[in-house]
Amino acid sequence: MKKIQISPSILSADFSQLGNEIKRLEEGGADMIHVDVMDGHFVPNLTIGPPVIKALRKQCSIKFDVHLMISPVHKYIEAYADAGADIITIHPEATDNLEESISKIKSLNKKVGVSLNPETKIDLINNYLEKIDLVLIMSVNPGFGGQKFMPEVLDKVKQLKEIKSKRNMNFDIEIDGGINFDNCQSAIEAGANILVSGTTVFESNNGDIKKNINLLKLK
């Protein structure tokens, strides 16, 4: 079994102190930083773009797990790669040609993630799993932080785990949306090995990031 990793979402950080917040996450033992990029078109919210990611990249050395909720996504992939993304995750619905977009990310020497919204079926990406490094299962409808976890998506996580085992694959299974101390164990048991968490990491236990990360890892 892969080791459990925590990818805190900076959507829940203090945006007036983003540089310091990134440093706090690194010092607190975060395995990577989850950066939610929203365009107000593919999802109903606006967040940050390449210049902010480029500035933040200078503040820490751990991986940037960049989740692109933008459409059309293909023409922006290179800009986020250049800004410092290590993993670039896209939605199948946001590109005209998923295979081309996957190849584009790989050509830039970045890890490829593909995200599935709660209603999106695994069948949509089944033929691409050999080329994917990470599958991100959304456990809320994307667009805003702080939403309630949708337990029904754990069936999808279990299905992916079975596919991985049957086809002897090695992609990561990441879960994002409403992850907290009450549901992290069920997410891990279902097969997720990367947990995205924002509010829980930044706000629980008086903001003790190290403690919160360890609790999410069931330590």
Label for each model-derived stretch:
Residues 111-115, 119:
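Internal catalytic-core helix/loop-beta-alpha segment
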Residues 34, 174-175:
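Generic enzyme active-site microenvironment
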Residues 1-89, 93-97, 104-112, 124-132, ...:
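Conserved N-terminal beta1-alpha1 strand-loop-helix module at the mouth
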Residues 6, 175, 196-197:
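A structural signal for the hydrophobic beta-strands that form the central parallel beta-sheet
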Residues 140-142:
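Short glycine-rich anion-binding loops that position phosphate/pyrophosphate groups of nucleotides
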Residues 178-190:
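Acidic, divalent-metal-coordinating active-site segment for phosphoryl/phosphodiester hydrolysis
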Residues 192-197, 201-203:
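Acidic, Mg2+-coordinating phosphoryl-transfer loop and its flanking beta/alpha structural elements
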